[in-house]
Amino acid sequence: MPDLLLELRSEEIPARMQRKAAGDLKKLVTDALVERGLTYEGAREYWTPRRLTLDIRGLNARSADVREEKKGPRTDANEKAIEGFLRGAGLNDISEAQVVSDPKKGDFYIAIINKPGRPAEEIIAEVMPGIIRSFPWPKSMRSGPASMPKGSSYAGIEGKGSESLRWVRPLQSIVCLFGPEHDETQVIPFVIDGIVAGNITYGHRFHAPGPITVRRFEDYVSNLEKAKVILDADRRKDIILHDAKDLAFANGLELVEDEGLLEEVSGLVEWPQVLMGTFEEDYLQIPAEIIRLTIKTNQKCFVTRNQGAEEGLSNRFILISNIEASDGGKEIIHGNGKVVRARLSDARHFWNRDQGDLPDLETLKDSAAKFDLDLKKPLDQRMAKLDALNVTFHAKLGTQGERVARIRELAKALAPVVGADGALVDRAVVLAKADLRTEAVGEFPELQGLMGRKYAVLQGENESVAAAIEDHYKPQGPSDRLPADKVAITVALADKLDTLVGFWAIDEKPTGSKDPFALRRAALGVVRILLEKNVRLPLLSVARDSDLLSFFHDRLKVYLRDLGARYDLIDAVLTPESDDLLMIARRVEALTAFITGEDGRNLLAGAKRATQLLAAEEKKGTVVADGVSEELLKLDAEKALYAAIKTASADAAKAVEGEDFRSAMQALSTLRAPVDKFFEDVLVNDEDAAIRANRLALLKAIREATGTVADFSKITG
């Protein structure tokens, strides 16, 4: 079956856009072909900095013939209805329609419309221009003669003004080939703003800029590689990672791996060449995180460390070039080294300035007094400055200083709940946001918290306070580590709860896929801390909003489900007012263990049967009594069940009060045999109305007994 090869070659595409753009191209093209009746066996997208490529295998040579029946009006319909039918069906005369008889509806017209299949070449040429013109780039531009004002022309190309092609960077050539796997392929001709699709591509911009004639995908890939272009981005990543590790190892070093940077640099080169640069060892006095970010952000280079070292860095870095230089890369290394040293010099300047005094300490005394700050210490000065400048946190939620004051009050209440030292918690809170006014964080915002910790250690803060300054931002996702120290746990909870309560108060809640303030992440962080650090916190005591509590419930469900818990078991123990998430999780754990055992499964069946019978009666308007009359218990099975319910209810309630949910489940398991015996021997719908009502009350007692730990009616299976 025929294959299709499409290449869109342009100036350099930003690395961050390449992978998604290639995926978009695949989806848009394959969807358009399938929509027009062309199926295929497989498709794969490729990308380099200068091209998007699509390889579609096993594409039908033509679309299938289609036979449609279009139902029309009755044969005795008025002329206007018949004319409308003819127009819609594309018929010239009613004699071209067929008449069908229906015993109920009478005779009516139908039109048989036969649509012959079309050659794939025709369909491809038809869909490509529209796909390219409407391509969903995040940012795009107009370029070339076609972007000139309408009415003007250049080199035979007419200006189209705003109607000209928008592409991420100037589009230079298009390859579009279709044909059998082994025979000659043909060019599918179409034109985009003077660019004619053909069979010519070009290799590496510097090493092999000449034209390459393409026949099919295999020789396209091999000829590009001869022309110093590796088409497969994942292969470029593998080459970069392998060669970088080897080069580091050869110099007695280890590569500090960075998946995000690896993805980016693989999108900056078509022919990756791995080189090593150096900088002066004096710069190693700067924190390793600043060095890594400086080199990564400004030069897209990897850092290294000594072999076997867990911390610290070496003074050598790995750079990736797109040129196989004749001098072995000496000039490239020299040029990158100059820039790296200049950037590290700036970083050292930030680092040193952040440890010095601010020039306007007199103006900070009021803020210092408000937060009990010591203006002899650099980090305290930065916190005072943050407050004095009235830096806005959110237009409706006040300044950063006001936010810290709120977190301070909340943390004061949370400290005894967590078991943290109140004085250390207070000190950690007032310094937690101070590094937002440091120059290092101003240059690299992703270092907030971490730099605060380093500056706190330098000014002699307690180890728990320093750790809390960094860790109060954690966890920042489902796999991020949690704060370990109790002081850090307290500040992290206070920070996240203040954010959530505040945004709920101003009605800035997540909607659909939109969550600009990362409130879902904050709520999940609270859930993880409470459950994984065994913190008992009644959320309604701090988040006095039922809707916010419901939001926590949703995050809890997601978290527990990811751990393997069943949704129905979570729902069975969760009530709208449940605000102790740790206890909810423990109930789910105990219920899961109980329900997977034989006693649990059988009791569940009996309890659900009782609930269904009660629901049917209550639907009829029957009012079921709250208590059971022992004198109306006539049969041994119902007497035994009532005695078992009284014992099990008392034992389960006592266990729940002691938060021993496994024992509560064990107490309920004793009901299994009496419930089974009751349904075997007892007819609930007795002829005697009083006995019947009493037996319904007994069923209600079963429901209430099991309800001490869960709502069994919500459990499936």
Curated annotation (Swiss-Prot):
Q: Which reaction does it catalyse?
A: tRNA(Gly) + glycine + ATP = glycyl-tRNA(Gly) + AMP + diphosphate
Keyword Cytoplasm found:
yes
User: GO cellular component annotations, sorted alphabetically?
Assistant: cytosol
Alphabetically ordered keywords of this record:
Aminoacyl-tRNA synthetase, ATP-binding, Cytoplasm, Ligase, Nucleotide-binding, Protein biosynthesis
Q: Which domain of life is it from?
A: Bacteria
Q: Which GO terms describe its biological process?
A: arginyl-tRNA aminoacylation; glycyl-tRNA aminoacylation
Q: Where is it located?
A: Cytoplasm
GO MF annotations, alphabetized = arginine-tRNA ligase activity; ATP binding; glycine-tRNA ligase activity
EC numbers: 6.1.1.14
Signal peptide coordinates:
none
| Family as reported in the entry's similarity comment | Belongs to the class-II aminoacyl-tRNA synthetase family.
Q: How does it assemble?
A: Tetramer of two alpha and two beta subunits.
Q: Which HAMAP family match?
A: Gly_tRNA_synth_beta (MF_00255)
NCBIfam families tied to this protein: glyS
The name of this protein is: Glycine--tRNA ligase beta subunit
Q: Which gene encodes it?
A: glyS
